[in-house]
């Protein structure tokens, strides 16, 4: 006689089974499962008890088929090497979880071709929305997807050649805060060290020029277009840097000189460098959360024109 135990796959319990166990109508179970009103606390408790007893789980596939949604979002970053990107992701992930969305993610290694391929692949898998930290350049490959209803939000950089929402740090305001700080310390010859990111460098440079002019300080375009090599010999007493990488480059380039440095965006160990580096800081997790909230509103039916949301910045003087 065999001692083998035969395993029988019992059918999964249905809402009809729950209704029968709880002694209520099928519609009542549906209301409880979907969090709809119209059920007394006592009845809801009885239905929830039946759900627990039977081990019932809602059929997400059927529900999503009815709504035409997949309850998934796609997040595409230009790189994972920057801790700022991970913080953006955390903020977005929290919002997605709160609203019942699963978040897919990928990175492009700052390659526009990979960005297009990855974005369209996520759209082909029917994500409900996209959040993108884009590479510079055109994003018109998303025009047809956005017109087809894929909610899309760009973060840290605005979209180019496509109409979509964007969430950015207040770059122009950040430049003005930095110049005000340096001018307040008595600096008159202030330079700007930009980077390859066209939008951010242009916006910060314009903010610097406005702030310098407002204070009657020299607006020298040569000093507002520095790179690390030119900074090493430039006639400046202070420099504002476009991002973390440029700030570190300025620290190396000005190591033998007494040049005051303010960076846009905080970074690890900035407070431990001698002398410590002042920064114009913004909260990347808040940027991710704000982008997620904006996307959820779009998915809920917000038809307002695309908007650009600016997250506030603050000076951390060191």
Where in this protein do the model-derived segments appear?
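N-terminal helix-turn-helix DNA-binding module of bacterial transcription factors
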Residues: 1-70
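Short beta-strand segments enriched in small/hydrophobic residues
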Residues: 26-31, 65-80, 181, 189-195
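Short, solvent-exposed amphipathic alpha-helices that sit
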Residues: 46, 83-98, 174-178, 199-219, ...
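Amphipathic helical "hinge" segments at domain boundaries
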Residues: 56-121, 126-129, 209
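Flexible loop/hinge segments that line or gate small-molecule binding clefts
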Residues: 110, 132-177, 245, 265-277
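Hydrophobic alpha-helical segments within soluble ligand-binding/sensing domains
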Residues: 165-192, 226-229, 247, 282-300
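An alpha-beta-alpha
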Residues: 176-215, 307-318
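Flexible loop/turn connectors
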Residues: 234-240, 245-318
